[in-house]
């Protein structure tokens, strides 16, 4: 193996690990899947109401056990519906759109909604690849900073025959490690 390539790989891996560890705990989500932990950096400056909702629901244990009900390879994985059908949500009121100029790239976390732009509630999705057709039409509230390989391992389907579930989802500040 080329020593320069090896060293570059080590530096990149360390950089990602340090970035994930150095993230502000109050604005970091730990989403544990059966395959491992996904670390999501929250973006409260971009979508304050959506970030507040995600944190509120995570702190209440709302997402624990909820399945990824819509997973399209090469596009996105969607979860956050307690019924597992894509039609449900929390008992909280829907949120107004907080669209931004942030692009949907691999690992972007956005809020799912109906055709009504002000209908986001608890469902969210993580993009597998750049999705420019979503830009400006869906609220971006986070980005995966570590563990995207675990999102890649989520079972595909609409719905998947054996769906992957969120084991636990917590605000990092609330997790003792």
Predicted feature descriptions by range:
Residues 3, 7, 11, 15-177:
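Cyclophilin-like peptidyl-prolyl cis-trans isomerases
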